[in-house]
Amino acid sequence: MLESESRCETTANQSSSDVDKLKKTKDNLEWVARFNISLNEDMERHYGFCDAMCKIAVAMFGTYAFASLFIGKSIAYSVCGVVVTALSILTLVVDFKEKQIRAKSQRNRYSSALASVDSVKDESDCKALNELLFEIGKDDLPSGTICDALAINAAIDQMGRDVTYKANVGTFKRITRYIIPWGAPKYGHR
């Protein structure tokens, strides 16, 4: 009688640890998806802003340079013409709109992966979802450590995790995260 009871107890402990392991794996997969959604959302906003600002600047300086043909020529008009040319070349070479669309596509792919986290029932589903997240990640745009830190902070907020693990990103680093990407945040307790 004691031997059968110990077998049942061992089986119950194994299934409990399997459930805990599955829950932890699902939690990690949700973390990865939320982190990447936040990161791609940030990039989408940034590249959309850059695209809009370049278009506005080209329109303003272009109008100013075109008006110089009718008003008269001076150094200021020539400088505006050079600025328009430089901004036009910048938008053609960097193509902010394409990067914005790519970041939005990645965000949507990660969102659909996040939606499937709840349907994970066993370890094979976890492996399949992990492979899907890995495949999606192959197409990610490069990001800096400050962008990653802000995405980590957003994922911590979304999942209700302990705020002591949030990265301390200063205002200057937050504003210049795409211009000066090599800055490093401070992690840990504040």
Language-model segment annotations:
Residues L2-M60, L90-R190:
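Conserved non-transmembrane functional hotspots
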Residues V58-F66, V84-S88:
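Hydrophobic, membrane-inserted alpha-helices
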Residues Y64-V83, T91-L92:
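Hydrophobic alpha-helical transmembrane segments
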Residues F70-I75, E98:
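Membrane-interface helix caps and helix-loop-helix hairpins in membrane proteins
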